[in-house]
Each structure stands twice: as structure tokens, then as C-alpha cells.
Amino acid sequence: MTWKALLKDDPTPWLLEPVLSTVEGSDLANPGVRYFALRDLLDRPEDDPEVRQARAAIMTTGPIPAILEAQYPDGYWVKPGSGYSPKYRGTVWQIILLAELGANPSDERVRRGCEYLLNHSIAANGAFSAYQRPVPSGSIHCLNGNLLSALLRLGYADDPRVQAAQDWQARAITGEGIQYLKSGTSGPGFACSANQGQPCAWGANKAMKALIAVPPDQRTPVMQRAIEVGAEFLLSRDPAVADYPYTERVSSTWFKFGFPLSYWSDVLETTAVLVELGYGGDGSTEPSGRASGRGLAEVPRLANAFQFILSKQDAQGRWKLENTLNGKMWADIEKKGKPSKWVTLRALRVLKRVEQVRSAQDASSR
């Protein structure tokens, strides 16, 4: 059974619609979806003419032109400094958004923004800081993970500053050679002062996304240990219930799929992280290659998450935008409560990855 068989209908043609309108809020003004659908769902190479055309449209249509129009000549947005504030118009958030929307890493404006961030947002411990004057007490997993994921997408994998932040991220998770503070990341295993010193699953998802974006053969031993710690933590609860340690009750944000997520997370993101690690194609919580290959619905901890994701599709195989930052960014992205190309893309990536995990396990068991 292919991943499309799990859908009530095939939304791929909808995702592949060409950019026909630039009307604010129009789902047709999000050319990044077409680019990513061609690349990630149809497996088209980067030099494919349609892929190249779709990627070029990203820089001229939709949210990215509005973001770049607001950039100051020195490379920052709104005001000089580390760029965390104001949410969600400061420098930090634009770099994250540019990467998520598919900005061209070679664009001079994008490079200028990345360089400004790297030169003004890193604390003495090597991590990114949320404070206007970057100090170690402002280093938190959600921020560091989001920015590392963005910078890797934007071509900075070999930059020593990025590699230092990766090392901090991994060591802050495992507790190796890290001096924790009362503010910010306050202990190993994703402990965060914003969560009353408890492990933060939102931060865990962001940190894990950043670490698993590093190719396996390029991960350091401490990165691999951190990934194992993160997987164990995320699998310690049912992602569909999301009753991870929290300040009060479980946040309803977990159950509302959105784009972009910023520092928030949802069930779909947790599932995406675990499936990317190879969990989900077998009958246990062991990653790909260690078990029998029976199917995601039988996997403890992931079965409910998978069914929850599928239950949210409509009759056309689309997912709604339930969580949004519209009105707070330089440009709105789709409309809340309406079918979302971005959220649908997120869901389909997970479904396709599950099929890849299953296929790999079937091949290894032969």
C-alpha cells in the first residue's frame, strides 16, 4: 500500500498549482509549496526545469518579497541587535521564515541577513541567545534548533559558528561539558527555565530537527548521543496526548496544525521527527532496521499520533490551517480555518517518509 492510499483523495495536483495570483491571503501566492511538492513528493531533481522555475518564483511572489523589502541595508530587520524581538518581525524570525519558505541561499539579501544574525546573535557559549545583548542565559533549545535548521537549509553547514552552535545544542542535551544557568537552558534533557525547569518538548522537537538535519556520516558522537536522548524523551509519552512536562495543563497548540510554527510545536512535528529517525515502520519503538516491519498503526506511542494526523484530513485529502501567526508577520500566509497547502505538505511528507521507512525495513529483512 502506498502512502497515497491513506488519503481520502489526492491533493497533489492542488499543491502543484502554478502561482496565478498574488492577492494577499491567496493560497496561490505561496510558490514554495509547489517547489517543495515537486522536490519532496515527486522526487524531481533540483535541475528539473519545473523545479527551477518554481524556486525562482519563490523570490518574486508570495511572502518572501515582503520579508526582504522590510530588511535594512545592514542585514537586520526592525532594529539592530540579536534580533529575537519583536516577534515575529525581528531578524531571527525572518531567517527562520526565509528557510521554511524556500528562499534561495545564493540571494545576496538572504546571505546578508544570515551574516548579520551570525555576527550579532551568538553568546559566549557558542549558542544563539534570545536577549538583545546575546548572553548564555538567553540560550534555549527552541531558538537554537530553529536557527540551526534554517541556517543548514540556507547553506551554512560548514560555517564554524554554526558548527559551534550544533555542538552546544548536543552537549546541552546530554549534559557533557555544559555549565547550566538558572535562566534559559537550565539542565540536561531539554530542561528550560521557561518551563519551570522541566524538560520542554517544544524545544526538544526543534533541537532534534536541527540535529537530524546533519547527515548521519557527519554527526559527531555527542550529536548521536543527543539524538538518542531526544528520541527517548519524545517517545516517553504518547505524542497524540502530548502530556509532556508543562507548566500547567497540556497546551492546546499541540493539537492545532499550523504553519509556520515558530517556537510552538504540534503532534505533526513530533511525528515527523520520529519518523525521520526511522521509527514508525515496525512493530516496536526501535528505529528503522531493528524490527520486523509491520506497520505504523501497530507502533506503541506512534499509533495514536498517526491516526490523529489522518483524522484531520478533509474529503479532498487536505489539512486546515488551525494555528497561524497571521497579522504578526511581514506577510500573511494562507487563511486560518481554511485548507492549507503548507500544512498538507507537512502531513504528506510524513506519510511518504513512513513508506520509505517501511520499504527500507522490508528490504533489510529479505
Regions found by a protein language model. Name each.
Residues 1-366:
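Preference for long, amphipathic alpha-helical scaffolds in soluble/luminal domains
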